[in-house]
Amino acid sequence: MNAKTKLVTDRIRLRCMEDRDQATLFGLLFNDPDVMTYYSGLKDKRQTREWVNWNQRNEKGYGVSLWIAEDKRTGEFLGQCGIVPQQIENQTVMEIGYMFARRHWGNGYAQEAARACLDYGFNERQFGKMAALIDPGNKASIRVAEKIGMHYSKTIRKWNKPIAVYERKSYN
């Protein structure tokens, strides 16, 4: 594994975001209305650059961020998945986040990558609890959270809308 690679699964390599990823993130995720349905809207190129910078700061400060998900064999961009600090009711909680390009939906990539992040968070980083913050209408994302063993905890108000919090406590 090179220094930029964070995790590897059977099919996916998760690596740190780089400035060069901005165009791909914009073109395949942030400018696709279907992918962004449950977000507050599409992101423009400036917002995409800020997103990459935010993830780079998280990586430097916390050692975790949303990582670029690539096909391990071909290097093709699949999406993003990783762990980011989020505020939930005045507490910092480590969130597993995932978003994949539409053409890769239905292939189990989100579940595979999210499970790897969960394992990393609990086994390598010793996080006591991890969460997924999900728009209640996003049934596909809820299924991913449930398949990796997360359970509905509560609904909070975040990002100017109701957000369902799914949680899982450490394996230990």
Swiss-Prot record:
Residues 12-172 form the N-acetyltransferase domain. SUPFAM superfamilies: Acyl-CoA N-acyltransferases (Nat) (SSF55729). InterPro entries: Acyl_CoA_acyltransferase, GNAT_dom, N-acetyltransferase. It holds the Pfam family Acetyltransf_3. GO terms for molecular function: acyltransferase activity, transferring groups other than amino-acyl groups. This is Uncharacterized protein YkkB. It comes from Bacillus subtilis (strain 168).
